[in-house]
Swiss-Prot record:
Belongs to the CheB family. This is Protein-glutamate methylesterase/protein-glutamine glutaminase 1. It comes from Vibrio cholerae serotype O1 (strain ATCC 39315 / El Tor Inaba N16961). PANTHER family: PROTEIN-GLUTAMATE METHYLESTERASE/PROTEIN-GLUTAMINE GLUTAMINASE, PROTEIN-GLUTAMATE METHYLESTERASE_PROTEIN-GLUTAMINE GLUTAMINASE 1. The modification 4-aspartylphosphate is found at residue 55.
């Protein structure tokens, strides 16, 4: 039986185009369309689609409000379409907060090399989230603007500053059932995390649980368009105790700071342990992903060797496998997110099947495991 899809967009051209692409895949069938969020909510309840594709900017009711309504009453996997603008990025992140599982730029040809690849990309994204009802969440409360209040920003800044002071009070790092995990005893100088589909929510779950005194730098590689990463880094920074920033060329790595690879570029490490810096380069057109997990992991292996704690989280494809292989050859630690907690079990499966990862962990316990491993729990 074909996967039933509801297409939601106020543009008749885009509804027709998306419907044609979806219907050209035999496993998918567009059962209806909706022209605004209110109509989408009604048809989601009545038609019970397996997947919804949803525009963000629509009359009557916008896509974010529609996602919240649908998740509260008739949860279904939702793929968002958004514009490649800063405001579009922020709105997309709001939609993911509300419960949408994945997103694509509305001009999805912009992240594909040709039309055939663009068609396949959309079809694969719909197929990948179709069976993921277990990941559907109750909607988050509407996010006020600005994301973080001045008082909250001040509080976070003071806490971060205290952590770098010899007199700073160490915050509580207690985690539930930490005794189930045992630290390996290895010493680390870098944490590296790579992810794709489902990554924004996964990274938020992990990073918000890390204390301000996390002992070494963190590099994050999330497949994301160029205009999205700054907004994503800003959002994470407003929610986390650690500092999170979009990486810039020449950044010196500092403990307790997470550096998010900028979209459309490659992030590499240069220098030596204790004095390492980031290099942000174009990387050429031969790479399938920009940023690419393999590129960052490979450079981390050369600089930090066995002093890297690395993780591959939910994502489509196999990016990260070869970089993780280089890390393993250097003696580093590689973990993978387990299948049950992945939105798409592609990237973690690739490292697990290759025998590269040493532990497969549920998303809810990765931060706990990290804290045990680095000696903070």
């Amino acid at each position: 039986m074909a996967i039933k899809v509801l297409v939601v967009d106020d543009s008749s051209f885009f509804r027709r185009r998306v419907s044609e692409i979806i219907n050209s895949e035999s496993r998918l069938e567009v059962i209806d369309v909706a022209v605004n969020g209110k109509e989408a909510v009604e048809k989601a309840a009545r038609l019970k689609p397996d997947v919804i594709t949803m525009d963000i900017e629509m009359p009557v009711m916008d896509g974010i409000s529609a996602v919240r309504e649908i998740m509260a009453n008739n949860p279904v996997p939702i793929l968002m379409f958004s514009s490649l603008t800063h405001d579009g990025a922020k709105a997309t992140l709001d939609a993911l907060d509300a419960g949408a599982l994945d997103f694509l730029p509305k001009k999805f040809e912009d992240i594909a090399r040709n039309r055939d690849e663009a068609v396949t990309l959309l079809q694969q994204r719909v197929l990948s989230i179709a069976s993921k009802k277990m990941f559907l969440r109750r909607p988050a409360a509407p996010r006020p603007a600005p994301t973080t209040s001045i008082a909250a920003s001040s509080s976070l800044s003071q806490e971060r500053a205290a952590a770098t002071s010899p007199l700073g009070n160490r915050p509580s790092t207690a985690v539930s059932a930490a005794t189930r995990f045992k630290a390996s005893g290895k010493k680390y100088q870098l944490t590296a995390i790579g992810t794709s589909t489902g990554g924004p929510v996964a990274l938020q779950k992990i990073l918000t649980k890390l204390p301000v005194n996390y002992p070494h730098p963190i590099v994050l590689i999330q497949h994301m368009p160029a205009t999205f990463t700054a907004a994503f880094a800003s959002r994470l920074n407003s929610l986390c105790k650690i500092e999170v920033k979009e990486a810039e060329d020449g950044d010196m790595l500092r403990p307790g700071v997470a550096y998010l690879a900028p979209g459309g570029k490659q992030m590499m490490l240069d220098g030596r342990p204790g004095a390492a810096r980031l290099r942000i380069i174009d990387g050429g057109d031969r790479m399938n992903y920009k940023p690419c997990v393999d590129v960052t992991f490979g450079s981390a292996a050369k600089i930090f060797g066995d002093k890297v704690l690395s993780m591959i989280l939910t994502g489509m494809g196999a990016d990260g496998r070869e970089g993780a292989r280089m890390l393993k050859q250097a003696g580093a630690t590689i973990w993978a997110q387990d299948e049950e907690s992945c939105v798409v079990y592609g990237m973690p499966q690739a490292v697990a099947k290759a025998g590269i990862s040493t532990e497969d962990l549920p998303l809810e316990r990765i931060a706990e495991r990290m804290l045990v491993e680095v000696g903070l729990a």
